[in-house]
Design a protein with these regions (language model features):
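N-terminal Rossmann NAD(P)H-binding glycine-rich loop of SDR-like oxidoreductase domains
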Residues: 2-24
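SDR active-site strand-loop-helix element
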Residues: 5, 29, 78-82, 118-124
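Short glycine-/acidic-enriched loop or helix-start segments at secondary-structure transitions
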Residues: 14-15, 38, 89-90, 129-131
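Short, well-ordered alpha-helices that flank and scaffold nucleotide-derived cofactor binding pockets
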Residues: 17-21, 41, 108-112
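Conserved Rossmann-fold NAD(P)-dependent oxidoreductase catalytic core, especially the SDR/UDP-sugar
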Residues: 25, 92-93, 97-151
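Glycine-rich phosphate-binding loop and adjoining beta1-alpha1-beta2 segment
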Residues: 30-50
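NAD(P)H-binding glycine-rich loop region in Rossmannoid oxidoreductase-like domains
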Residues: 44-98
Length: 151
């Protein structure tokens, strides 16, 4: 079975449609039941409302290890799509808790539960801004661990 974190978000909800169209068995992590309605709308957009009922929903949070451990039961593969996106400096503590500690929790659960494959979905925004002489960021862009976005 595949676990999708961030299943109620933009990428996670579209990923759910794709996985279910491929007849995968999917467990989806959610924090708020009202967000599940948004996922229904994504399935309706693709005319796949019948597939929506095949989702195994589990309430949890990547920052809450006990709820993650419950979510990881009977899982073989994980798509980690959960993250907080904000460019507001006042959100730094919450960004670190969710995006760094939460991701570490997911990775540790993958190790503890013997997960076969983890796919971490992220954003190019995590790499920061290009340097003055660069116009784009690519796989060849130099990674500088001293940059603020690198931790």
């Amino acid at each position: 079975m595949i676990l999708v974190t961030g299943a109620t978000g933009l990428v996670g909800s579209h990923l759910l449609v794709q996985l279910l169209q491929e007849n995968e068995e999917v467990k989806a992590l959610f924090r708020s039941e009202k967000q599940i309605e948004k996922v229904k709308n994504v399935f309706a957009f693709y005319n796949q409302t019948a597939l929506f009922d095949k989702i195994n929903w589990v309430k949890g949070d990547i920052t809450d290890i006990p709820s993650l451990e419950i979510a990881f039961e009977n899982i073989t593969h994980v798509y980690h799509c959960a993250a907080l996106i904000s460019f507001d400096p006042s959100d730094e503590d919450e960004l670190r808790k969710i995006n760094i500690e939460g991701t570490a929790n997911v990775v540790n659960c993958c190790i503890d539960f013997g997960i076969k494959k983890l796919c971490h979905v992220s954003s190019i925004a995590a790499l920061g801004n290009p340097k003055e002489h660069e116009t784009t960021i690519t796989e060849e862009t130099e990674w500088n661990p001293e940059e603020l976005h690198s931790d």
